[in-house]
């Protein structure tokens, strides 16, 4: 059997009811379709980050935040690629603060990774929130990618301080 509705044929399948998000409904006690998420629930694709966007949060991340990703080639390759996309224009391919925007004097004072004490946790925190003239990259890269970039930045730093 076939039901015709708007020139569409649905054979032997359930035809779902399309609810409007804010429509009235007797399915819930408050009478509306859209419900407030259960306390403690986490949105899909979002990961909690317990360090605040403060100097104290930065220092805490610097000393206590540890990378959960493995030190394997796949992470290194992806970290290097992401660094080239998001970081090298300011920080340079070597991490010396001499990226294309710096050499063209679009920004001044981009730090070299050898200039200060950084850790994977502090790098992750800066990617999450931004710092000084650098904006947050949390919207561009997910948590795993931030850790991969942090891993690559630490490799660059180690080469610079040798």
Predicted regions and their residues:
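C-terminal capping alpha-helices of c-type cytochrome domains
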Residues: 121, 125-133, 138-162
């Amino acid at each position: 059997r076939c039901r015709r509705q708007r020139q569409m044929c649905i054979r032997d399948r359930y035809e779902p009811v399309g609810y409007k998000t804010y429509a009235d409904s007797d399915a819930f006690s408050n009478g509306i379709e859209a419900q407030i998420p259960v306390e403690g629930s986490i949105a899909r694709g979002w990961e909690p980050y317990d360090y605040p966007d403060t100097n104290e949060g930065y220092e805490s991340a610097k000393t206590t935040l540890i990378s959960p990703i493995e030190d394997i080639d796949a992470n290194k390759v992806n970290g290097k690629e992401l660094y080239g996309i998001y970081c090298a224009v300011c920080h340079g391919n070597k991490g010396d603060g001499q990226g294309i925007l710096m050499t063209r004097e679009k920004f001044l004072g981009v730090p070299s990774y050898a200039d200060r004490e950084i850790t994977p946790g502090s790098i992750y925190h800066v990617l999450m929130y931004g710092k000084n003239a650098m904006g947050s990259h949390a919207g561009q890269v997910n948590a795993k990618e931030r850790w991969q970039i942090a891993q690559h930045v630490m490799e660059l730093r180690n080469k610079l301080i040798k």
